Amino acid sequence: MEKFEGYSEKHKSRQQYFVYPLLFQEYIYAFAHDYGLNGSEPVEIVSCNNKKFSSLLVKRLIIRMYQQNFWDKSVNHPNQDRLLDYKNYFYSEFYSQILSEGFAIVVEIPFSLRELSCPKEKEIPKFQNLRSIHSIFPFLEDKFLHLDYLSHIEIPYPIHLEILVQLLQYRIQDVPSLHLLRFFLNYYSNWNSFITSMKSIFLFKKENKRLFRFLYNSYVSEYEFFLLFLRKQSSCLPLASSGTFLERIHFSRKMEHFGIMYPGFSRKTLWFFMDPLMHYVRYQGKAILASKGTFFLKKKWKCYLINFWQYYFCFWTQPRRIHINQLANSCFDFLGYLSSVPKSPLLVRNQMLENSFLIDTRMKKFDTIVPATPLIGYLSKAEFCTGSGHPISKPIWTDLSDWDILDRFGRICRNLFHYHSGSSKKRTLYRLKYILRLSCARTLARKHKSTVRTFMQRLGSAFLEEFFTEEEQVFSLMFTKTTLFSFCGSHTERIWYLDIIRINDLVNPLN
């Protein structure tokens, strides 16, 4: 029992950090702006929010924050559309953006201090089963060949605002900071119901990327914390009481209701959660839960996840967000690939003395296919082609130089080939290269007021060189592996291109 209670207190901060006064320091906002320019993701310059930083406006904001009626108008008039009741749209948007960015920097400080305060003599435990995004594809190729069932989970995130704040109370015990977080969430929810409107969620995510990422990661880590607990302690859970692994102080009443609605849930059904071969992979808003167990086991996990989201996070999630499929008869979309584990027939000729016979065996192979329809839809949305895949010109780029136009098209083409180099079939990639190359030719011909054929004849091989460099780099990722017993002598294996963090939109065009 003490072991379970200690495990459930893992994320609770033992020291109380008062981070709210940092919002009155000018260097916090300068640091937030510098992080946006030099962070891991390119800054999307859409409006004045991300491309301008005024030290004078930040000083004015700090001066106004010292005033007593700073939040009165926004709190007492929740139906107004602009922060701080500013008539000037620029000031309203600038203050809202810079304040949310500074707040996102501040609330991350307790997490950093907790990691830095770890004593040096106490070694941080290393989890060998936790891997980075770079190793996901080799992991799937190595492990999924031996599994039977897969649950494709779309992680729900429109949760209740107050529950989201309460999840952070275990890590951030600074009450003014939590009230400020409530203000931001209520400010954006008043646009049109943050709970039910996907448009409001999109606007909040677009204008407050860092804060949205922090809140979303906090929510996901909370549910993964219990998922990992169940996975590691499933053999001991039937011996414990039904409330030890889900109990929280402010959720005790919820747990009592949970016990009334589902008596003996933890004591009885958790016996079916015991599975030594279960693997969990998550990227963005999707997750994969694969195992070698039975279909009945996967249904139990699905039932548990739905009930867990309903009674712990206090919102209902649709059962259709969790799809259970058999790996041998279906494919799943993950990280921009359509992956499957089909059984391929293999004929082996066996010679024994004077008798020879054929042995028909079936082997599993992790197969990855580039989805043509989503990628063509992405290129169509970016105005490189029509919805049916017919290449068109890019009029907005005709003001650029010829070299810049070639460089942009070539970079997109190389990114596609680099990321999807692990695909077992390259036909879709060659089709995408044809679309981009002809779109580039049409764009240059439109700029010089010429036809595509005339322009191609005048430009010659220099135009094609930019679009063939990616094949050389892809082929350089292939290596020859000589096997000891091989009928063909040698064969090639797929090498996944790992530099995929910077390719934002092309990583998963479905999002």
From Swiss-Prot:
Described purpose of this protein according to its UniProt entry: Usually encoded in the trnK tRNA gene intron. Probably assists in splicing its own and other chloroplast group II introns.
Organism: Psathyrostachys juncea
InterPro entries for the chain: Domain_X, Maturase_MatK, Maturase_MatK_N
Pfam families xrefs: Intron_maturas2 (PF01348), MatK_N (PF01824)
Subcellular location: Plastid, Chloroplast
Any one GO molecular function term: RNA binding
GO CC annotations, alphabetized: chloroplast
HAMAP family xref list: MatK
Disulfide bonds: none
Keyword annotations of the record: Chloroplast, mRNA processing, Plastid, RNA-binding, tRNA processing
Record gene name: matK
Protein name: Maturase K
Entry's Gene Ontology BP terms: mRNA processing; RNA splicing; tRNA processing
Family stated for the protein in its record: Belongs to the intron maturase 2 family. MatK subfamily.
